[in-house]
């Protein structure tokens, strides 16, 4: 309560000053005011005390964290100085780890920042963009023209279009059945015409996560194409509606007896339990021929180990060769035994090295009446979950050379029209797929392209079990990021778009189906302003690469009915 001032007395006069001082003195002498001041002063001290204690605690916490960080840094530095494996770390403790960090994220940095649209490998940015946009159902067109130096490019494909092409197929038309009926030439009980020329190649559960395999199987069911199980066997992740090609590897996973050897009864039982349309015997793989399959220890979880019958947490290495047969003759006995027990078409998958095996195989097929129903040629540039670099880079012929040589062996033996040929090894792009079909492929198997569709970012960590996209991993945390239902839709969209663009290319060449496009329509640039037809480059004779006359006529009828229906 202040001392009242005279309203008439101007502020700042001597009298007003005396009255203000008297008011202050009165406040000091007043007991109530003194008590109020003491209470306020206590509160101030209490607040200041709380603030000081909080500050002390914060300082102590920061000091503890700092000491902990310092201890960790010193421990790492000590380890770096004492270890003997890495010279960089011995010479530059702590900061030397930056080198390994940059090395670890190098693929991602190059992918998004450094490289051009066409130079990255194994799939360039342009190729990945086409795959991704096809999967999303987005615009797959590119503007402004090609990025490629066409005239200076060596081994560059040019498609010779027809002057009077067929009408452009409607956007919704993408049905492309196989030109041949699988198993018909050998009279198998369960012959069938594969409904799609584009199918998903062998990628086993274990190498891929269960959610990834489920997404692929669901997508195949939607797209009406075949899903190869891979050598890991038929698992619960393969039972979501997609029709299957059951692969038998050298480890015989899923069809082995207690002794680890092949069990025909077990195979027949497994094949009858799911929509298996064909059985593929894996002789070798393009990325690592001469070696068996390798599943890194990080991927051998308890579930994978139980399905394969192998120890948990240890590298699962398949033998380099089969124990059920040892040459072409015993292989054909093995094939015929499986076909008799299951009624299914049976074929082989192989990389291409020596041609002697193929010559012996075709001789026996011609002379004995035994034979394979299909042959899958896997190019040396094909994918793998894990392989030695020397094998991936230098063992086995690339697809186009290998395919043309094997096809030539079958053609000279008069058997090319009786066998369905499938190809794999970076064929999931329209131009590569058309090239393969002109060389005689009836089916195109896509592998890494399918992985890109369901989330792969080409991080190239498949062999570590730490795939960041949840595709090639067994980590539950990483795999949970992959939603099978949505990724299945993307796979179906990708397959449909690839078939549609293949159909567009065929129509541009004046043919209703890509299986009818021959090597005469393809030219290969030599990088020196010259070109040669693929017929000459690969030594093809007239009619090679085409189905039989009867199959061609039937295929034209099928495509004609599809065109009318559209």
PLM region spans:
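Intrinsic low-complexity, intrinsically disordered coil/linker regions enriched in small/polar
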Residues: 1-52
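Conserved, well-structured core domains of diverse proteins
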Residues: 57-221, 225-228, 232-242, 246-258, ...
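Flexible, glycine/charged-enriched surface loops at secondary-structure junctions
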Residues: 230-232, 344-349, 372, 416, ...
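Glycine-rich tight-turn/loop motif centered on a GG-T
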Residues: 246, 254, 297-326, 385-400, ...
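Mobile "lid/hinge" segments at catalytic clefts and subdomain interfaces of large enzymes
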Residues: 273-275, 280-282, 286-308, 460-477, ...
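Glycine-rich phosphate/ribose-binding loops and adjacent secondary-structure elements
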Residues: 317-479
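Gly/Ser/Thr/Ala-enriched C-terminal appendages of enzymes
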Residues: 428-431, 437-543, 548-561
């Amino acid at each position: 309560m202040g001392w009242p001032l005279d309203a008439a007395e101007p502020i700042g006069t001597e009298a007003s000053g005396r009255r203000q001082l008297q008011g202050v003195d009165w406040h000091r002498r007043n007991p109530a005011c003194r008590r109020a001041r003491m209470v306020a002063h206590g509160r101030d001290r209490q607040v200041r005390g709380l603030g000081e204690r909080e500050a002390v605690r914060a300082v102590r916490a920061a000091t503890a964290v700092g000491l902990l960080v310092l201890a960790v840094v010193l421990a790492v530095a000590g380890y770096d100085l004492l270890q003997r494996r890495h010279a960089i770390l011995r010479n530059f403790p702590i900061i030397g780890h930056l080198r390994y960090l940059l090395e670890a994220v190098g693929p991602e940095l190059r992918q998004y920042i450094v490289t051009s649209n066409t130079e990255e490998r194994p799939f360039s940015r342009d190729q990945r963009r086409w795959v991704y946009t096809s999967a999303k159902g987005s615009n797959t067109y590119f503007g402004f023209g090609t990025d490629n130096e066409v005239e200076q490019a060596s081994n560059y494909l040019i498609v010779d279009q027809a002057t009077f092409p067929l009408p452009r197929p409607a956007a919704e038309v993408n049905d492309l059945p196989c030109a041949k009926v699988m198993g018909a030439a050998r009279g198998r009980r369960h012959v069938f015409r594969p409904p799609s020329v584009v199918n998903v190649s062998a990628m086993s559960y274990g190498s891929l996560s269960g959610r990834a395999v489920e997404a692929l199987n669901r997508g195949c069911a939607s797209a009406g194409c075949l899903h190869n199980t891979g050598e890991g066997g038929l698992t619960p992740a393969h039972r979501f509606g997609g029709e299957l090609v059951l692969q038998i590897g050298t480890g015989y996973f899923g069809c082995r007896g207690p002794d680890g050897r092949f069990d025909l009864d077990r195979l027949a039982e497994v094949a009858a339990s799911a929509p298996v349309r064909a059985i593929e015997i894996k002789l070798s793989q393009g990325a690592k021929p001469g070696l068996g399959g390798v599943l890194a220890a990080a991927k051998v979880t308890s579930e994978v180990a139980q399905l394969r019958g192998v120890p948990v947490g240890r590298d699962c290495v398949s033998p380099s060769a089969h124990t059920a047969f040892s040459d072409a003759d015993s292989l054909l006995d093995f094939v015929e035994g499986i076909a008799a027990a299951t009624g299914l078409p049976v074929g082989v998958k192989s990389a291409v090295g020596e041609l002697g095996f193929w010559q012996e195989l075709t001789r026996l097929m011609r002379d004995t009446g035994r034979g394979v129903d299909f042959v899958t040629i896997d190019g040396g540039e094909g994918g793998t979950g894990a392989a030695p670099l020397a094998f991936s880079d230098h063992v086995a012929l690339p697809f186009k050379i290998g395919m043309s040589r094997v096809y030539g062996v079958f053609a000279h033996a008069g058997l090319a029209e009786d066998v369905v040929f499938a190809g794999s090894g970076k064929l999931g792009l329209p131009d590569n797929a058309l090239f393969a079909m002109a060389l005689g492929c009836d089916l195109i198997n896509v592998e890494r392209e399918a992985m890109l569709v369901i989330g792969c970012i080409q991080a190239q960590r498949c062999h570590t079990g730490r795939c960041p996209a949840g595709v090639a991993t067994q980590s539950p945390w990483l795999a949970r990021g992959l939603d099978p239902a949505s990724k299945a839709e993307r796979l179906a969209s990708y397959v449909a778009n690839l078939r549609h663009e293949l159909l567009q290319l065929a129509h541009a060449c004046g043919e209703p189906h890509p299986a009818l496009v021959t090597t005469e329509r393809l030219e290969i640039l030599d990088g020196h302003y010259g070109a040669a037809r693929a017929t000459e480059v690969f030594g093809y004779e007239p009619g090679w690469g085409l189905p039989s006359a009867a199959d061609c006529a039937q295929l034209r009828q099928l495509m004609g009915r599809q065109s009318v229906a559209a």
